[in-house]
């Protein structure tokens, strides 16, 4: 008889308790292959895709999320929020859920919208790909075909996208992402027009049932640096940290030693009971560990962020933030050190929000200092002869002078908090549209099917061609689901739209085939591109997966426990058997 370690891999010990008897049994880690593996993976992916895809399009349904034992249920229409809440008991099925969930999460990280589209695309590619893998197609070649086809589609999206040139387009993009709410679309367009493209747009929970827009000039800053450690997060569902009325420590040096933090962190801030935001070149080793421990213990509500930029640009940007917040940059060049910091040298803000991708600072007051700084930057722009330097100065000026728009979200009940999620999607979609332009809405990808098919047949062979055709079939999945969510069959409508101009799509709200640009149904090109890229990436990864190793959550009977213990420790065999029969009687 061969040992389990030879047959099944590494053994694992688990302790079982029976009355006052503790027994250790040996169980193996489960390893599934081929049909079993793919079947369980598919079931998990099917469950997630169905739960998320019902929300797609203007006729999409809502999903109710349980909020635990005490909170009210939450009604949402946001794909990534739904995906994060799904956990299955079966480990293999849950792995399938987690894999498809990545497509939504990555799209949300990059574009802030399009998570449901990414999920539908990824699911369609995986389902079609698995059929071919089961028919002995080479998964690596299929992966290459998927990647090449995806690059072709992305190049087509870039070619057909239109730049956003007016407020009307911004309003339309925001309205579509907010669930066809034109009032919200207009509000976001007004906010961008007032604060500029580099300005800050922030969301707050309102105190009434009405959603309001509050504008201030020169009081906000967004830096593209997020928290150094996820242990600083205060809201694990949204993976963000929000601080009200925090102090802000600004320094251009690395913080490596605990001794550098003691004066400001433990002696000054802890006595005020106010939060602390640290913006430094970096926070390393024991200093970071100290901050995290004190955060978790509730001694100081702190979050650390790396300073933006490099070299002299970093110093000037830190000085800009210092002027905005009324603080000073702790720099050795200015004769300051962390050991000698006083409370009046720290900046202050009304609120800060830190996520993985960036930090939003909303300050109050200091308008005169900010205006003076803006004038100084304008003079530097006039004097500069370098186009690169002028561009960077313009960015700084836009950030300082752009201002802040605060949208106070009103909701009648806790259950209607979905409104805030839709507003977030709308803001992110609008910013994405400004960056990379717009394309027609209503699942534009369907128009690339014919071009992709011609390109693939001319450039690819064998299993690579199969990979490209998998992408081709998946391109119709978003439109198919949008139409099905209206309650009608999709096949006839899809065939009608395929051969028409790029701007023609299906207006699911009215049930008509129309020009999407003319009726204002448009999507950001960045959102469509990100959804396509991430769906293809996840699908390729799943199709090249050969096996999964998971823990089998399987209880072991007392007889089995003793049996394996007898095999591994014969000296205690007799005593344990006597005890077993005694307990059994």
UniProtKB/Swiss-Prot annotation:
One of its GO terms (biological process) is protein refolding. Pfam families: Cpn60_TCP1. GO terms for molecular function: ATP binding; ATP-dependent protein folding chaperone; isomerase activity; oxidoreductase activity, acting on iron-sulfur proteins as donors; unfolded protein binding. The keyword Chaperone applies. SUPFAM superfamilies: Ferredoxin thioredoxin reductase (FTR), catalytic beta chain, GroEL apical domain-like, GroEL equatorial domain-like, GroEL-intermediate domain like. GO terms for cellular component: chloroplast. It is found in: Plastid, Chloroplast. Keywords: ATP-binding, Chaperone, Chloroplast, Isomerase, Nucleotide-binding, Plastid. Together with its co-chaperonin GroES, plays an essential role in assisting protein folding. The GroEL-GroES system forms a nano-cage that allows encapsulation of the non-native substrate proteins and provides a physical environment optimized to promote and accelerate protein folding. PANTHER family: 60 KDA HEAT SHOCK PROTEIN, MITOCHONDRIAL (PTHR45633). Forms a cylinder of 14 subunits composed of two heptameric rings stacked back-to-back. Interacts with the co-chaperonin GroES. This is Chaperonin GroEL, chloroplastic. The lineage of its organism: Eukaryota, Cryptophyceae, Pyrenomonadales, Pyrenomonadaceae, Pyrenomonas.
């Amino acid at each position: 008889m061969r040992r389990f370690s030879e047959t099944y891999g590494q053994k694992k010990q688990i302790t079982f308790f029976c009355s006052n008897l503790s027994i250790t049994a040996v169980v193996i880690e489960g390893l599934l292959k081929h049909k079993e593996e793919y079947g369980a993976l598919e079931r998990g992916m099917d469950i997630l895709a169905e739960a998320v895809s019902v929300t797609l399009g203007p006729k999409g349904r809502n999903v109710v999320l349980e909020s635990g034992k005490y909170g009210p249920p939450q009604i949402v229409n946001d794909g990534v929020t739904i995906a994060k809440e799904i956990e299955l008991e079966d480990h293999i099925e849950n792995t399938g859920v987690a894999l498809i969930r990545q497509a939504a999460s990555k799209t949300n990280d990059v574009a802030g919208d399009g998570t449901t589209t990414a999920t539908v695309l990824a699911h369609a590619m995986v389902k079609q790909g698995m059929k071919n893998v089961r028919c002995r197609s080479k998964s690596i070649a299929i992966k290459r075909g998927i990647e090449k086809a995806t690059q072709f589609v992305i190049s087509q999206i870039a070619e057909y996208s239109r730049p956003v040139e007016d407020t009307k387009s911004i309003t339309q993009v925001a309205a579509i992402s907010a669930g066809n709410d034109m009032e919200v679309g207009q509000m976001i367009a007004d906010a961008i027009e007032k604060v500029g493209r580099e300005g800050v747009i922030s969301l707050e929970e309102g105190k009434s049932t009405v959603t309001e827009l509050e504008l201030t000039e020169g009081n906000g800053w967004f830096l593209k640096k997020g928290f150094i450690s996820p242990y600083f997060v205060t809201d694990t569902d949204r993976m963000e940290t929000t601080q009200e009325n925090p102090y802000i420590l600004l320094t251009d040096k690395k913080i490596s030693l605990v001794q550098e933090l003691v004066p400001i962190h433990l002696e000054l801030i802890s006595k005020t009971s106010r939060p602390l935001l640290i913006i430094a070149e970096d926070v390393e080793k024991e200093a970071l560990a100290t901050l995290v421990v004190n955060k978790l213990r509730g001694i100081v509500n702190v979050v650390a962020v790396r300073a933006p930029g490099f070299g002299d640009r970093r110093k000037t940007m830190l000085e800009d933030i210092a002027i905005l917040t009324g603080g000073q940059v702790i720099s050795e060049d200015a004769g300051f050190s962390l050991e000698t910091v006083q409370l009046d040298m720290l900046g202050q803000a009304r609120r800060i929000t830190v996520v993985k991708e960036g930090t939003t600072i909303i300050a109050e007051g200091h308008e005169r200092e900010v205006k003076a700084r803006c004038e100084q930057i304008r003079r530097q722009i006039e004097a500069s002869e370098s186009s690169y330097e002028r561009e960077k100065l313009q960015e700084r000026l836009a950030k300082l002078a752009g201002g802040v728009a605060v949208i106070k979200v009103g909701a009648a009940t806790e259950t209607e908090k979905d409104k805030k999620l839709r507003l977030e999607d709308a803001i992110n979609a609008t910013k994405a549209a400004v960056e990379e332009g717009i394309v027609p809405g209503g699942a534009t990808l369907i128009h690339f099917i014919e071009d992709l098919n011609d390109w693939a047949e001319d450039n690819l062979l064998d299993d690579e061609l199969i990979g490209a055709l998998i992408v081709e079939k998946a391109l119709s999945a978003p439109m198919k689901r949008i139409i099905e969510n209206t309650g009608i069959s999709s096949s006839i409508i899809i065939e009608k739209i395929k051969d028409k101009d790029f701007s023609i799509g299906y207006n699911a709200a009215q049930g008509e085939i129309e020009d999407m640009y003319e009726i204002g149904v448009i999507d950001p090109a960045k959102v469509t591109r990100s959804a396509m890229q991430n769906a293809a990436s996840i699908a390729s990864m799943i199709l090249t997966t050969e096996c999964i190793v998971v823990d089998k959550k399987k209880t072991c009977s007392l007889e089995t426990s003793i049996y394996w213990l007898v095999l591994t420790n014969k000296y205690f065999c007799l005593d344990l058997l006597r005890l077993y029969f005694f307990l059994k009687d």
